[in-house]
Regions:
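Amphipathic, Lys/Arg-enriched alpha-helical "gate/interface" segment within cytosolic domains
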Residues: 1-126
């Protein structure tokens, strides 16, 4: 399951339990919309509640990251499970992404908000 919310710094995404291809499609749609609205939107990806992911989702995720490697600003990832963290780091090695990893949401949000003046705000192009 996935929840996606627009924030002043970009998108805040929380993954719950299993991250499926259907969840990724929702994320992809939100990310593409954010790219249209703001140059280099920031992303907070909270994986602390994620327990597993499907292989088809992982393949689509890699494809998307390769296609849009230079379309995003900062990416903050919240994760506490060592295996999920290793998997995320491996995926980022394949895609040239350089996210920063955090243990808590507050610190991650603060880091993303520091970059807001450089990346714009979601919905500011109205």
């Amino acid at each position: 399951m996935i929840s996606i919310h627009e924030q002043s710094y970009g998108l805040s995404v929380v993954l719950h339990n299993e991250f499926t291809l259907e969840d990724f499609r929702q994320l992809e749609e939100a990310l593409l919309k954010a790219i249209e609205q703001v140059q280099f939107p920031n992303l907070l990806l909270d994986m602390s509640q994620m327990k597993d992911f499907t292989v088809d989702m992982a393949l689509e995720h890699l494809r998307f990251l390769r296609q849009h490697a230079h379309d995003f600003g900062r990416t903050a990832i919240i994760v506490d499970d060592i295996w999920i963290r290793l998997g995320a780091r491996f995926a980022n090695l394949l895609t040239l992404q350089r996210p920063k990893y955090f243990n808590d949401k507050h610190t991650a949000q603060k880091w993303l908000e520091q970059n807001v003046q450089n990346s714009g705000v979601i919905g500011s192009n109205n």
